[in-house]
């Protein structure tokens, strides 16, 4: 009886090892990295996770940009297609949202703070400088709805180092390749 228990245990262990080995082989990483491409086939970014892409500016600055699904008229998601996310805000030291742009930091370790705002010309990504936050005298805030004058001192802000119109530079729809 003891020999049968040992033999059965060995058979189960070998079978489990074979299944685990097969799973390990099936899940090996692709030799080609996953990339986000725009509607023209140009590289738009590399995924940090399913909705955060790392976009490289012409100046060499790398910053996170958010994507979201594209929906059909009935509210269903389009298969394999995405577009740039909007809905952020940028704080300015000027009263007309033209100079002194600042954004909040990122909750994700190791990436710059960014904001994406929808403008009449497309979705614009504002990328912060690397460093420590500061307190700024804010005179206006740019939202998707436009520029709003304010007068407030706000802490936790980073100066904007780079700006790119994502819709113009990487026109949607976007897809992973």
Model-derived features with residue positions:
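Extracellular/mature segments of secreted proteins
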Residues: 89, 104-108, 152-159
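Short coil-to-beta strand junction motifs in C2/discoidin
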Residues: 84-87
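Predominantly extracellular/luminal cell-surface or secreted proteins
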Residues: 92-93
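Bacterial N-terminal signal peptides that target proteins for export
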Residues: 1-7
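N-terminal segment immediately downstream of the Sec signal-peptide cleavage site
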Residues: 23-79, 176-177
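N-terminal signal peptide c-region/cleavage motif recognized by signal peptidases
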Residues: 17-19
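Low-complexity intrinsically disordered segments
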Residues: 130-177
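An exposed acidic His-Trp-rich patch
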Residues: 98-148
């Amino acid at each position: 009886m003891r020999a049968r228990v040992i033999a059965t245990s060995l058979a189960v262990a070998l079978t489990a090892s074979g299944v685990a080995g097969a799973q390990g082989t099936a899940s090996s990483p692709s030799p080609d990295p996953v990339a986000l491409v725009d509607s023209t086939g140009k590289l738009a970014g590399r995924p940090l996770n399913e909705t955060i892409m790392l976009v490289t500016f012409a100046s060499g600055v790398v910053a996170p940009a958010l994507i979201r699904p594209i929906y059909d008229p009935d509210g269903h998601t389009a298969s394999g297609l995405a577009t740039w996310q909007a809905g952020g805000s940028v704080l300015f030291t000027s009263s007309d949202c033209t100079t002194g742009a600042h954004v909040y930091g990122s909750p994700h370790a190791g990436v710059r703070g960014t904001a994406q705002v929808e403008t009449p010309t497309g979705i614009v990504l504002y990328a912060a400088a690397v460093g420590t936050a500061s307190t700024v005298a804010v005179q206006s805030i740019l939202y998707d709805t436009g520029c709003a004058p304010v007068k407030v001192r706000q802490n936790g802000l980073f100066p904007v180092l780079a700006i790119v119109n994502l819709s113009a530079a990487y026109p949607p729809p976007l897809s992973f390749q």
